[in-house]
């Protein structure tokens, strides 16, 4: 879930979100772009989410999309299929804005879901 507040920008300033898998922490040249499903919320005063849309990146215009949230859902099986050695998922946020605040948090699912995890003991 990515949230942002009021942005100081003009009509051309954007936030672009990508999800990349990698064998190294942080974005690298060997990172693989992941396809994800996203939903963009209405402004904070609204109670409406946009339709679920599949993409490898999503760009929002800062001036038209102040104080919104973006839900990004990545299928763990797709990450494994694209890059079996991936240890990291990076949320890449490219911004062309003068000023603003962005926060993100993640709920991580197991790569191999099971009812009881095996231990080494």
Give the label of every model feature segment.
Residues 1-121:
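Surface-exposed, low-hydrophobicity beta-strand/loop segments enriched in small/polar/acidic residues
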